[in-house]
Amino acid sequence: MFIVSLSYTAPLSDIDALLDQHIVWLQQGYAAGLLLASGRKSPRTGGVILARGERAELEALLARDPFAVANVARYEITEFHASMSAPELDCLRNI
């Protein structure tokens, strides 16, 4: 499993102009089975994505994000192996 931390590198007006395209891109990632969860950081300085699959697949997906194409965000990918969880999140183990 991967934790992706997005940090905006442009004003929010630039982010907002691409937001609808970014949401479509997220929907495609969920449909492909790569994305598990996503959302904004608070304060609104970027976002966080939980993903699964192979790192190369994830990197290719991230490269197609409209935020990446427009160079308005940077991405930090952390691979994570959940060894313990709350019972309601057991499904995240062994991903």
Regions flagged by a language model, labelled:
Residues M1-I95:
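Conserved, structured core segments of small domains
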